[in-house]
């Protein structure tokens, strides 16, 4: 597998006014590969943004090296780096009435002459970038008139206009609703695969990262940085350990976080399909430990359907009560 970017015993952090060094993380050895979507995840304050800025060449490392192909990243001229690495930051860009097309055209700056004139070839790249992200119809609209999801697509198009081998995005879904978050993640996954690009993004959306990433970089507070398949890091307990917090736990079986509640004891649940899934979630929210398909529990919920209608039976040692809605079940057991 080819490598487009690699770190070698990298140390990241800051030098404050007195030139004293504040190391955030050290001994980092990671790689990025063409065609892969890599997600960097971890709690706030772990150093994700510092790592992203260092890998993008925006911040010098405290020690070690970042190599871009065979070259050391931080020794290359900025114009040369810009032809290989494109960055989309979290900060909202305020550009007045600049059109989406004009913003994307700024991505051609590393290729234009000193007057910034666009050749026909540059114009074609800009149009193609907008088309690729599904934003061609937004070209003439001012950026200030776009929704957050539309704006993010345009920002990604601007990065694509640089024709980079590597795309680095700092929390690209931070201000988006759920459908737009899914849309942007699917877009980035496609851009990596079909464009043979290495894409690295940081995110707090663990569920989407687990579903969409080819590889995870897991950065807990204090390190170390761990790399692996999403499923592998879930199975070996690294995800649960990294996000361990009082009152919250990561459920390896469901691949999601669960809020720890005062226990109500075990409860049996039998049934299939969506009704069983959402009934289990409602019971767990109340604090029950749900045991599937068990006949030995003192309290059981049996789900049955007939003629398209769902019925819930709450079975106790001396009673069997039928309910027509999940609301009634939860009110009875709550």
Predicted region positions:
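Conserved ABC transporter NBD signature motif
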Residues: 64-72
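Catalytic Walker B motif of ABC-type/P-loop ATPase nucleotide-binding domains
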Residues: 167-171
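Helix-to-loop junction immediately C-terminal to a conserved catalytic motif
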Residues: 56
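The feature captures the beta-strand-to-loop junction immediately N-terminal to the Walker
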Residues: 41-43
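Conserved ABC ATPase "signature" region
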Residues: 120-138
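Conserved catalytic motifs of ABC-family nucleotide-binding domains
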Residues: 163
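Conserved ABC ATPase signature
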Residues: 142-146, 150
């Amino acid at each position: 597998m080819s490598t487009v970017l690699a770190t070698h015993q990298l140390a990241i952090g800051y030098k404050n006014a007195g030139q004293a060094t504040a190391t955030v993380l050290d001994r980092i050895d990671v790689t990025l590969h063409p065609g892969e979507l890599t997600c960097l995840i971890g709690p706030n304050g772990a150093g994700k943004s510092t790592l992203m800025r260092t890998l993008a060449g925006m911040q010098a490392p405290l020690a070690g090296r970042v190599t871009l192909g065979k070259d050391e990243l931080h020794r290359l001229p900025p114009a040369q780096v810009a032809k290989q690495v494109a960055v989309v930051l979290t900060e909202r860009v305020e550009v007045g009435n600049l059109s989406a097309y004009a913003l994307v055209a700024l991505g051609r700056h590393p290729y234009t002459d000193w007057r910034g004139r666009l050749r026909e070839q540059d114009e074609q790249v800009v149009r193609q970038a907008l088309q690729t992200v599904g934003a061609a119809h937004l070209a003439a609209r001012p950026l200030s008139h776009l929704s957050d999801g539309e704006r993010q697509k345009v920002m990604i198009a601007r990065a694509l206009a640089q024709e980079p081998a590597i795309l680095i995005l700092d929390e690209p879904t931070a201000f988006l609703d759920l459908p737009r978050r899914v849309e942007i993640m699917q877009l980035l996954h496609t851009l990596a695969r079909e464009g043979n690009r290495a894409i690295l993004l940081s995110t707090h959306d663990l569920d989407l990262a687990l579903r969409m990433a080819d590889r995870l970089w897991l950065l807990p507070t204090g390190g170390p940085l761990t790399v692996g398949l999403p499923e592998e890091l879930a199975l070996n307990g690294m995800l649960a350990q990294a996000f361990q917090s009082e009152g919250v736990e990561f459920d390896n079986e469901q691949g999601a976080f669960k809020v720890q509640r005062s226990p109500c004891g075990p409860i049996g649940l039998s049934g299939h399909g969506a009704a069983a899934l959402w009934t289990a979630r409602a019971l767990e929210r109340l604090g029950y430990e749900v045991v599937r398909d068990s006949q030995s529990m003192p309290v059981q919920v049996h789900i049955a359907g007939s003629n398209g209608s769902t019925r819930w039976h709450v079975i106790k040692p001396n009673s069997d009560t039928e309910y027509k809605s999940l609301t009634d079940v939860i009110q009875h057991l709550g």
